[in-house]
C-alpha cells in the first residue's frame, strides 16, 4: 500500500469520525431539549400540587364507618367541597382513619379549621391544614439503621462484683 492510499483511508476515517461526532452532538442537543421540557412540566405539576394542597385540609380521627358523603355534608358549612378522599390500607382495603378534603378555593380552609374538635360519629375530628409532601423527608436520610447496638465492645461479662448502690 502506498503512502497516498494510507492518507486517503485516514482522511476517510477522519471524515466518518467527524460525522459520528456531529450526529452525537445533535442527539445530545435533542436530549437536553427534552430534559428541559420535562423539568418545566414537573415544575408546573409541583406548583399545581402545592396550590391544591393550599386549599385542602387533613381530617384525623375519622371513624372507620364514615362515608365521603357524610364528611362532605359535615364540611358543607365551610364552603364548596371539590373532593373528599378517605385513605385506605392498600392490602386490606380498610380505611386508615383519616381523610383529606379539598375545597374550591384556599380562602375556605380557615372556615374548615374551625371544625377542629367537632364530633362526627361520636369522635372528635382533628382538622389541620394539609401539608405539602416533600419527597425523601420521611426517610430521614439514612438514619435509623442498627438501632440499639451502641453498647461497647465484647460479649458477656458476667455479674459485676462489688458495690452496686442501685
UniProtKB/Swiss-Prot annotation:
<dbReference type="InterPro" id="IPR000504">
    <property type="entry name" value="RRM_dom"/>
</dbReference>
<keyword id="KW-0694">RNA-binding</keyword>
<dbReference type="GO" id="GO:0140602">
    <property type="term" value="C:nucleolar peripheral inclusion body"/>
</dbReference>
<dbReference type="GO" id="GO:0005737">
    <property type="term" value="C:cytoplasm"/>
</dbReference>
<dbReference type="GO" id="GO:0008143">
    <property type="term" value="F:poly(A) binding"/>
</dbReference>
<dbReference type="GO" id="GO:0033620">
    <property type="term" value="C:Mei2 nuclear dot complex"/>
</dbReference>
<dbReference type="InterPro" id="IPR035979">
    <property type="entry name" value="RBD_domain_sf"/>
</dbReference>
<dbReference type="GO" id="GO:0071920">
    <property type="term" value="C:cleavage body"/>
</dbReference>
<dbReference type="GO" id="GO:0005730">
    <property type="term" value="C:nucleolus"/>
</dbReference>
<dbReference type="InterPro" id="IPR012677">
    <property type="entry name" value="Nucleotide-bd_a/b_plait_sf"/>
</dbReference>
<feature type="domain" description="RRM">
    <location>
        <begin position="55"/>
        <end position="132"/>
    </location>
</feature>
<dbReference type="GO" id="GO:0106222">
    <property type="term" value="F:lncRNA binding"/>
</dbReference>
<dbReference type="GO" id="GO:0000785">
    <property type="term" value="C:chromatin"/>
</dbReference>
<feature type="region of interest" description="Disordered">
    <location>
        <begin position="129"/>
        <end position="166"/>
    </location>
</feature>
<dbReference type="GO" id="GO:1990251">
    <property type="term" value="C:nuclear exosome focus"/>
</dbReference>
<dbReference type="GO" id="GO:0016604">
    <property type="term" value="C:nuclear body"/>
</dbReference>
<dbReference type="Pfam" id="PF00076">
    <property type="entry name" value="RRM_1"/>
</dbReference>
<protein>
    <recommendedName>
        <fullName>Polyadenylate-binding protein 2</fullName>
    </recommendedName>
</protein>
<dbReference type="GO" id="GO:0033621">
    <property type="term" value="P:nuclear mRNA surveillance of meiosis-specific transcripts"/>
</dbReference>
<feature type="compositionally biased region" description="Basic residues">
    <location>
        <begin position="140"/>
        <end position="160"/>
    </location>
</feature>
<dbReference type="GO" id="GO:0005634">
    <property type="term" value="C:nucleus"/>
</dbReference>
<keyword id="KW-0539">Nucleus</keyword>
<dbReference type="GO" id="GO:0140517">
    <property type="term" value="F:protein-RNA adaptor activity"/>
</dbReference>
<dbReference type="GO" id="GO:0005654">
    <property type="term" value="C:nucleoplasm"/>
</dbReference>
Amino acid at each position: 500500500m502506498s503512502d497516498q492510499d494510507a492518507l486517503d483511508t485516514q482522511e476517510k476515517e477522519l471524515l466518518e469520525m467527524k460525522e459520528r461526532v456531529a450526529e452525537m452532538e445533535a442527539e445530545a442537543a435533542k436530549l437536553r431539549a427534552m430534559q428541559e421540557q420535562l423539568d418545566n412540566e414537573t415544575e408546573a405539576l409541583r406548583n399545581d400540587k402545592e396550590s391544591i394542597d393550599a386549599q385542602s385540609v387533613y381530617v384525623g380521627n375519622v371513624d372507620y364507618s364514615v362515608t365521603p358523603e357524610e364528611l362532605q355534608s359535615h364540611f358543607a358549612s365551610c364552603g364548596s367541597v371539590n373532593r373528599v378522599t378517605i385513605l385506605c390500607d392498600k392490602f386490606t382495603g380498610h380505611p386508615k382513619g383519616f381523610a383529606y378534603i379539598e375545597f374550591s378555593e384556599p380562602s375556605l380552609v380557615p372556615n374548615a379549621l374551625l371544625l377542629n374538635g367537632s364530633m362526627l360519629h361520636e369522635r372528635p375530628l382533628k382538622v389541620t391544614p394539609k401539608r405539602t409532601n416533600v419527597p425523601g423527608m420521611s426517610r430521614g436520610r439514612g438514619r435509623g439503621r442498627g438501632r440499639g447496638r451502641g453498647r461497647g465492645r465484647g460479649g458477656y461479662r458476667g455479674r459485676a462484683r462489688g458495690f452496686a448502690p442501685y
